[in-house]
Amino acid sequence: MTKIILTDIEGTTSSLSFVKDVLFPYAREHLPEFVRGHRDDTEVKRLLADARAYAGGDLDEEALIERMIGWIDNDQKITPLKALQGLIWEDGYARGDFQGHVYEDAVAHLRQWHQQGLRLAVYSSGSVHAQKLLFGHTAFGDLNPLFEAYFDTRIGGKRDTASYKAIAKELGVEPREVLFLSDLRAELDAAAEAGMKTTALDRAGNGEDFGPHPVARDFAGVGV
């Protein structure tokens, strides 16, 4: 019996284009000024130190900014960078520069499942902070009350089976009691290997090969 629905964000609850065409370019454009303006903030200072350590060199501020922009351009899932992006997006949401995109069908079914007593959680490569910002600033209002837990790369990579086992343990359930939703087969494979149930979201309807995983065009097609 399914007790928890664990959902991805990009390409699943939300448009890939929102992340790639709105959020990433916004963070890239505003990263230099944000770092220069907040370098002495305790959290930013810690994240910059973590990013510098990850880069493996004693980079000065401008070189580090350039390196991080390169990471953004290559869509690298680096934890301190993701956290910095989240802080930049927080400013953007607060200024009303954009709203978090969530598909209407996703909102309707997340609300329905929540009302039915199903527990809901999120697992995305974006930081937990960024996840909460996206769901907190949508055209449908603040959706965060629907979710009980959020997971990012701090628990492990999304293509690693161990990550899904760790999530189930954190949620206090057996993996078989979790239904994972994603648009990427490698993530679905890892979740299934951990023992979770899975459904692939094929919003583009491209007939992508999702192998043994059930496929839905939108949340209305997800069987729980």
Swiss-Prot record:
EC number(s) recorded for this UniProt protein: 3.1.3.77
Catalytic activity: 5-methylsulfanyl-2,3-dioxopentyl phosphate + H2O = 1,2-dihydroxy-5-(methylsulfanyl)pent-1-en-3-one + phosphate
UniProt KW Nucleus keyword: no
Disulfide-linked positions: none
Pathway: Amino-acid biosynthesis; L-methionine biosynthesis via salvage pathway; L-methionine from S-methyl-5-thio-alpha-D-ribose 1-phosphate: step 3/6; Amino-acid biosynthesis; L-methionine biosynthesis via salvage pathway; L-methionine from S-methyl-5-thio-alpha-D-ribose 1-phosphate: step 4/6
InterPro entries found in the cross-reference section: Enolase-ppase_E1, HAD-like_sf, HAD-SF_hydro_IA, HAD_sf
Cofactor: binding details: Binds 1 Mg(2+) ion per subunit.
Record has Metal-binding as a keyword: yes
Keywords: Amino-acid biosynthesis, Hydrolase, Magnesium, Metal-binding, Methionine biosynthesis
CDD domains documented for this protein: HAD_EP (cd01629)
A GO term for molecular function: acireductone synthase activity
PANTHER family, per database record: ENOLASE-PHOSPHATASE E1 (PTHR20371:SF1)
Subunit (UniProt): Monomer.
Function of the molecule: Bifunctional enzyme that catalyzes the enolization of 2,3-diketo-5-methylthiopentyl-1-phosphate (DK-MTP-1-P) into the intermediate 2-hydroxy-3-keto-5-methylthiopentenyl-1-phosphate (HK-MTPenyl-1-P), which is then dephosphorylated to form the acireductone 1,2-dihydroxy-3-keto-5-methylthiopentene (DHK-MTPene).
Identification of the protein by name: Enolase-phosphatase E1
Organism for this UniProt entry: Thioalkalivibrio sulfidiphilus (strain HL-EbGR7)
